[in-house]
């Protein structure tokens, strides 16, 4: 079977040091985590950045420092976030693209994050989506189409049809967000059936769903995402380190008779030109 690409999402926008001391929030911490995760089998790092108060930021200088330090220490594929959970302007969300990442996330729909108190609306208008897609296309940055539900996949296909995303496209199927598609085998099979025939896909399971979604993705021929962005626990009551989650994912894939790709092999699988 084809090799598995492991993406590490070490930081995200939510967990803070008060939640877990293991979440990396500074450029140096993120670069160190990137190095440790590459040693355990990761090929891609999905980068969110924080300011000095641990708040999510799209500041170019912070992303520039973080990306440069990751590249200095690793051969990982760098994927920057273009998240707009905090209601940022489109131009602000595009700032990380100036760091010339290999890939960038492109969320193709809006949803309520009802698991937070108070709840948050993650807004992605069609104008925002196409704005970011055009920026990525112009900069030769491969989008990772981030789908929190089935309709997000259809919007991703629409981008392909309009020439704003080149084929073969890559999708990240985020399962188990409170407000998104529930993390079940039936739902994962259904959403995969909506993908273009030549697309690649990865699966991210949120919280307790991370491990079972890892198993299902490997069995279905997909790739997997792990990390403290999605789940801060290794097991019930035991806080995880990012590199531990990568090591478990690598072991899991091996037990299911799929080897883990190197970063260069992942570049070939995803047809990255950078």
Q: Which role fits each region the language model picked out?
A:
Residues 1-22, 105-116:
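N-terminal small/glycine-rich loop or linker at the start of catalytic domains
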Residues 8, 27, 31, 44-54, ...:
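Histidine-centered catalytic micro-motifs
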Residues 10-32, 81-90, 118-122, 144-146, ...:
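Active-site mouth loops of central-metabolism enzymes
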Residues 8, 55-81, 129-138, 190-201, ...:
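Alpha-helix-loop-beta-strand connector modules within alpha/beta enzyme cores
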Residues 57-123:
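Active-site beta->alpha loop and helix N-cap motifs at the rims of alpha/beta catalytic domains
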Residues 18, 43-65, 174-175, 179, ...:
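Glycine-rich, proline-tolerant flexible connector loops at the mouths of alpha/beta enzymes
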Residues 30, 37, 48, 104, ...:
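Conserved, mostly hydrophobic/aromatic
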Residues 103-228, 239-240, 244:
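Catalytic alpha/beta core domains of metabolic enzymes, predominantly
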């Amino acid at each position: 079977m084809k090799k598995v690409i492991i993406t590490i999402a070490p930081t995200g926008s939510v967990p803070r040091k008060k939640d877990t001391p293991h979440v990396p929030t500074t450029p140096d911490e993120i670069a160190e985590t990137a190095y440790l995760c590459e040693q355990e089998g990761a090929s891609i790092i999905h980068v969110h950045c924080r300011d000095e108060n641990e708040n999510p930021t799209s500041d170019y200088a912070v992303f520039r420092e973080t990306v440069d330090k990751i590249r200095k220490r690793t051969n990982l594929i760098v994927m920057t976030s273009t998240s707009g959970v905090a209601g940022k302007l489109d131009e602000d969300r595009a700032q990380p693209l100036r760091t010339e990442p290999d890939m960038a996330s492109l969320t193709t729909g809006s949803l309520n994050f009802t698991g937070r108190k108070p709840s948050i609306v993650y807004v992605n208008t069609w104008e925002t989506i196409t704005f970011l897609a055009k920026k990525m296309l112009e900069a030769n940055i491969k989008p990772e189409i981030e789908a929190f539900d089935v309709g997000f996949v259809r919007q991703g296909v629409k981008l392909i049809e309009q020439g704003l995303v080149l084929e073969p496209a890559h999708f990240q199927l985020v399962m188990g967000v409170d407000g998104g598609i529930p993390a079940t085998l039936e739902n994962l099979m259904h959403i995969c059936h909506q993908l273009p025939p030549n697309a690649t896909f990865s699966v991210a399971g949120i919280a307790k769903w991370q491990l079972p979604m890892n198993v299902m993705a490997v069995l279905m021929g997909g790739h997997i995402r792990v990390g403290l962005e999605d789940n801060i626990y290794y097991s019930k009551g035991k806080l995880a380190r990012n590199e531990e989650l990568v090591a478990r994912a690598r072991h899991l894939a091996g037990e299911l008779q799929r080897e883990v790709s190197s970063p260069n092999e992942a570049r070939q699988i995803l047809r990255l030109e950078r």
